[in-house]
């Protein structure tokens, strides 16, 4: 399961001068869609106890807190890809690094990922990982039925859903409608802090520094900004004729007519 530690967007603010995110003092959380992806994997484990659930992330050393949350939910192993060489990565470079980590884990039947991360909203990393690994991908998954060697899923569409059968190994990106992530028990939280988290740098996953991080990122963020607030709405009262007259006056004031 590919997971990501993200800033809580309810607390995020933009530096008005530099146009960048102010991350200092902002709490970090497990990306919500990734929690649904992890729950999907854990439910497969609930049905078949021989299933091993592994969580993988790329990030700073502090991401171990998020990984321990995943372990407390029920994941068996956790891997952190952490290296200064990975810094400044766009989705292209991020997918390269995560794919390298997945190859290092090896013997993976299904890769789960959230539909998108709330700090980027691109929904690109999951499909890019699948492309780099040469496996099929199904996005916007809202239901999963697993059989021998294949998986049948419902793929969320704007006007309904699409039923897709896909062979394993494959990658599925999950939406929040798929499930309700489970809570962590006190016992599992204690166990999670007793488990080892494996940390890999670029050498451990056989990546050249020029092929990851900022060096391998064809896209870069030019500026982040908060859209200007829209004007407040105003309720008009009176008869139809009076309201029509007031509306015309308001539109004239704004030079809209």
Regions found by a protein language model. Name each.
Residues 2-257:
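N-terminal glycine-rich FAD/FM-binding segment characteristic of electron-transfer flavoproteins
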């Amino acid at each position: 399961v590919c997971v990501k530690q993200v800033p809580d967007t309810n607390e995020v603010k933009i530096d008005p001068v530099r146009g960048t995110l102010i991350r200092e003092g902002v709490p970090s959380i497990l990306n919500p869609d990734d929690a649904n992806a992890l729950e999907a994997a854990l439910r497969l484990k609930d049905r078949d106890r021989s299933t091993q659930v592994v969580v993988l992330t790329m990030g700073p050393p502090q991401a171990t807190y998020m990984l321990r949350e995943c372990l407390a939910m029920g994941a068996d192993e956790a891997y952190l890809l952490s290296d200064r060489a990975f810094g400044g990565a766009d989705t292209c470079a991020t997918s390269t690094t995560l794919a390298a980590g997945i190859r290092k884990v090896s013997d993976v039947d299904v890769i789960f990922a959230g539909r998108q991360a709330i700090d980027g909203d691109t929904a690109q990393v999951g499909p890019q990982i699948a492309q780099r690994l040469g496996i099929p991908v199904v996005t916007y998954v809202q239901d999963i039925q697993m059989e021998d060697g294949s998986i049948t899923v419902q793929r969320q569409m704007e006007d309904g859903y699409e039923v897709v059968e896909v062979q394993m190994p494959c990658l599925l990106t999950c939406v929040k409608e798929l499930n309700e992530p489970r809570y962590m028990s006190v016992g599992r939280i204690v166990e999670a802090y007793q488990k080892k988290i494996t940390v890999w740098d670029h050498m451990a996953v056989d990546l050249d520094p020029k092929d990851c991080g900022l060096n391998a990122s064809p896209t870069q963020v030019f500026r982040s900004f908060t859209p200007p607030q829209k004007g407040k709405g105003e309720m008009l009262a009176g008869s139809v004729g009076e309201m029509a007259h007031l509306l015309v006056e308001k539109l004239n004031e704004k030079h809209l007519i």
